[in-house]
């Protein structure tokens, strides 16, 4: 569990690199920095989070020194910010594939899977009117299967559990930041983001369930459109578009 090395100066995204031992949440820390005027590309990484969180208010926990928990401040125009959730999931996939030679898929909108188990998640907290967002990423790097909480052992993965070998966290961090830096200039091309996402779409063709207006509905996922919405054909034959902010998705068995 060797700690990440401090990185004085600027990182590959052009902003300062903030390395913390322990924090409640890297997203909270980064948000405070953003409100205080921290520049684009500021990276906050912590060895341990005590109150990390994911989408829909879910918690994110990982043993100290086993995962990467980081947040990045980006200052971009509104249209680019809209593409962040899908693009950052693609970036995380590419980084995992580069350092661990794994086959990653994305459960819309931005959970990263290996063999249908979650290895990473992305949480975007955006302020479009102010022109900035915080990109939070949690990646299970070196967590052993037995180190996951019992309730997650059937659904969680790490690069170590997927490959049966250790992955260097420094290399994983370098790959993550490099892929984020590569995608940020391309965000205003919704088609480029959608195309890259479709190549790794874990739900395309799957039966899914979701909740809308308090009612559970089911249907078949048919990929995403160029705006990043999930296209679904309901069991009643209706074509609907689902936006990430208004639904909760879960896979269901066919039949």
Per-range role (PLM):
Residues 1-98, 252-255:
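N-terminal lobe of the biotin/lipoate ligase/transferase fold
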Residues 1-3, 78-82, 86-104, 114-255:
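Long, positively charged amphipathic alpha-helical accessory segments at protein N-termini or as interdomain linkers
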Residues 21, 106-108:
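Short loop/edge segments at beta-strand edges and connector loops
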């Amino acid at each position: 569990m060797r700690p990440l090395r401090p990185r004085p100066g600027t990182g590959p995204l052009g902003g300062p690199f903030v390395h913390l031992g322990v924090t409640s949440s890297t997203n909270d820390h980064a948000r405070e920095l953003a409100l205080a005027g921290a520049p684009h590309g500021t990276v906050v990484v912590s060895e341990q989070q005590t109150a990390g969180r994911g989408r829909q208010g879910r918690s994110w926990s990982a043993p100290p020194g086993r995962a990467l928990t980081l947040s990045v401040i980006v200052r971009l125009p509104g249209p680019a910010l809209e593409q962040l959730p899908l693009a950052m999931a693609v970036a995380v996939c590419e980084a995992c594939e580069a350092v661990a030679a794994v086959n990653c898929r994305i459960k819309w909108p931005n959970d990263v899977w290996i063999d249908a188990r979650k290895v990473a998640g992305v949480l975007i907290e955006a302020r479009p009117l102010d022109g900035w967002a915080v990109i939070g990423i949690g990646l299970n790097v070196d967590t052993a299967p037995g180190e996951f909480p019992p309730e997650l052992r059937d659904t969680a993965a790490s690069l170590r559990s997927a490959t049966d070998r250790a992955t260097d966290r420094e290399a994983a961090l370098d790959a993550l930041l490099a892929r984020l830096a590569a995608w940020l200039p391309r965000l205003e091309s919704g088609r480029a983001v959608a195309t890259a996402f479709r190549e790794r779409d874990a739900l395309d063709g799957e039966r899914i369930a979701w909740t809308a207006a308090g009612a559970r509905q089911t249907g078949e996922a048919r990929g995403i459109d160029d705006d990043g919405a999930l296209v679904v054909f309901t069991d009643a034959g209706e074509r609907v578009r689902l936006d990430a902010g208004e639904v909760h998705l879960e896979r269901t068995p066919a039949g």
